């Protein structure tokens, strides 16, 4: 009897950490990234193999991501591996990820102000450079600012509703946030298509399109995060006390909002010299 109890005790986990089972996805994702990189290099250098390697690598990377994250969802939702200790580690990882994103945009702002505060002679010693017609900050950029700030409000309401257990309102305000995000991206695309300058037009065009383009990319990533959260809410994966992934997506979205405010004030408003 004692031996049986000892064997049963050994089958229980006596620590709060998640010891991940062997998984093929780290190796699969590494190989997929290698194929994607090689395919991209061959494509850029005109090799015919790049026409196959680049899309194949992209498909394999996306497949590895989806299958890996599927397993993470299973471990958290169905197997109960995400204890308080595990969630603390995930939270710390998300915070460090967001800090790294902030530092990325810090470098982009540094490049912008380095070029604009003391314009070189080649630029005409003025900012915007001679020959550049900047965008009117009170047209599409201002509308996009209002849209993004509104999305920050709707996602905050959605977060409050999931905490209070109002599932219907949570879904409604989350859908509104996603729609506002797509409106922002659509208007950003219209702005790019109709811009009177290109990325090749001096350092002004370079800093403008790189900074706003990277922000647009992060809006797309945040929209994907929110869409996945919506799918998980519809699938009854998230509850009022268990929605760390959704909270992480909301933190990310608020950071994207704040970065846009800095972009609007510095690049669109101050940088246009209105």
From Swiss-Prot:
Keywords: Membrane, Mitochondrion, Mitochondrion inner membrane, Translocase, Transmembrane, Transmembrane helix
Compartment list: Mitochondrion inner membrane
Annotated transmembrane regions: 22-42, 47-67, 93-113, 137-157, 170-190, 208-228, 248-268
Catalytic activity: 4 Fe(II)-[cytochrome c] + O2 + 8 H(+)(in) = 4 Fe(III)-[cytochrome c] + 2 H2O + 4 H(+)(out)
A biological process from GO: mitochondrial electron transport, cytochrome c to oxygen
Subunit structure of this chain's protein: Component of the cytochrome c oxidase (complex IV, CIV), a multisubunit enzyme composed of a catalytic core of 3 subunits and several supernumerary subunits. The complex exists as a monomer or a dimer and forms supercomplexes (SCs) in the inner mitochondrial membrane with ubiquinol-cytochrome c oxidoreductase (cytochrome b-c1 complex, complex III, CIII).
The protein, known as: Cytochrome c oxidase subunit 3
Organism, as annotated: Allomyces macrogynus
This protein's encoding gene: COX3
């Amino acid at each position: 009897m004692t031996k049986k109890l000892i064997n049963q005790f050994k089958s229980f986990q006596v620590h709060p950490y998640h010891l991940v089972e062997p998984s093929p996805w780290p190796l699969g994702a590494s190989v997929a990234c290698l194929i994607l990189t090689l395919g991209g290099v061959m494509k850029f250098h005109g090799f015919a193999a790049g026409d196959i390697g680049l899309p194949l690598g992209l498909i394999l990377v996306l497949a590895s991501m989806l299958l890996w994250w599927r397993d993470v969802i299973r471990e958290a939702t169905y197997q109960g591996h995400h204890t308080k200790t595990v969630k603390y580690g995930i939270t710390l990882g998300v915070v460090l990820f967001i800090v790294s994103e902030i530092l990325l945009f810090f470098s982009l702002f540094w490049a912008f102000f380095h070029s604009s505060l003391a314009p070189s002679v080649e630029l005409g010693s003025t900012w915007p450079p001679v020959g550049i017609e900047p965008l009117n900050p009170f047209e599409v950029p201002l509308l996009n600012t209002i849209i993004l700030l509104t999305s920050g409000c709707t996602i905050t309401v959605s977060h409050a509703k999931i905490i209070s257990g109002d599932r219907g309102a949570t879904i409604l305000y989350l859908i509104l946030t996603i729609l506002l995000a797509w409106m922002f991206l659509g208007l950003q695309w219209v702005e790019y298509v109709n811009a009177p300058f290109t990325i090749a037009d001096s350092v002004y065009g370079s800093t403008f399109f790189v900074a706003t383009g990277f922000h647009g990319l992060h809006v797309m990533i945040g929209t994907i995060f929110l869409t996945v959260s919506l799918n998980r809410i519809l699938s009854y994966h998230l509850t009022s006390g268990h929605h760390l992934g959704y909270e992480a997506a909301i933190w990310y979205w608020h950071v994207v909002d704040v970065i846009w405010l800095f972009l609007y004030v510095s690049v669109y408003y101050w940088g246009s010299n209105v």
